Design a protein with these regions (language model features):
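Active-site-adjacent structural elements that line small-molecule/cofactor binding pockets in enzymes
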Residues: 1-264
Length: 264
């Protein structure tokens, strides 16, 4: 285990992918079931079309769902894994986040990234640019979001936690060090320590305590869900996520991880 990180409680997150569910009630029932089985945080994603399966299948919009989830749940945290920075003016996004924070009673996590799915951009009229330009736009947007959150009346109910996903060592991890409360990585347990070390160097460069950043990662099923979860915990990850999609939203993996978390 990375001894430089604090002893945080292990938390379980579920990404309820808002695809292939032709009726909203299917998603609503899934987020309520997440709360019932003890999931700590329910995520969706910020796309306009399915990422797999029928490319033109049923799909719902991210932030409208989060506002509904805020009313339809009472304990679980909610957020996007992750919001695409390109799709909304930073000041507007800050106001949206503040509003959902209030609706939920302080349970929103603001997950954000630079965006990557070209079909979303092309179909909805956004400039796709390059990976580098999108990261530069994210770097410019984050201070604007923070500034607007500080000006809004009423203010957020809490300092809304910011989650940034990705592992780019030069730009993305620098943004994590500067702005994030949670870092979501897509690295395996074997790859993770090297990425975490890069993040620690960025934190040192910007004067940030790396222990202030919670580490999050997706748990893969191949080779065993629980062993894979434990391997991530052993290298310092404490927010463990799994994903499922519609129409059925099978929460078997999430329930397994919740039981494992509670038995530790």
């Amino acid at each position: 285990m990375n001894s430089d990180l604090p002893a945080r409680p292990v938390r379980i997150g579920v990404q309820l992918q808002p695809q292939h569910a032709p009726e909203y009630r299917q998603i609503r029932d899934a987020v309520r079931r997440c709360e019932d089985i003890g999931v700590d945080i329910a995520f969706n994603w910020d796309h306009f079309f399915p990422l797999y399966g029928d490319p033109d299948g049923a799909h719902f919009e991210c932030w409208t769902l989060l506002a509904a989830w805020a009313e339809q749940t009472s304990r679980i945290e909610i957020g996007a894994l992750v919001t695409c920075n390109s799709y909304r003016n930073p000041e507007l996004l800050a106001d949206m986040a503040r509003t959902v924070d209030h609706i939920s009673g302080g349970r929103l996590v603001l997950g954000i990234g630079s965006g990557w799915k070209q079909k979303d951009y092309d179909e909805y009229g956004y400039d796709f640019g390059t990976a580098g330009s999108r990261l530069d736009d994210l770097a410019a947007a984050l201070p604007r979001i923070e500034s607007r959150l500080a000006k809004l009346n009423p203010p957020p109910t809490r300092d809304i936690p910011v989650l940034i996903g990705g592992g780019g060592e030069r730009k993305t991890l620098r943004l994590v060090a500067e702005h994030a409360d949670i870092w979501h990585s897509f690295a395996s347990a074997d790859e993770y320590p090297a990425k975490a070390e890069v993040l620690q160097r960025h934190c040192s460069d910007v004067g940030r305590d790396p222990a202030a950043i919670e580490h999050s990662a997706a748990v893969q099923d191949g080779g065993g869900l629980v062993p894979n979860a434990q391997a991530l915990v052993d290298v310092g990850v404490t927010l463990l996520t799994v994903a499922c999609d519609g129409p059925g939203y099978d929460l078997t993996a999430a329930e397994t991880l919740c039981k494992w978390r509670d038995s530790r």
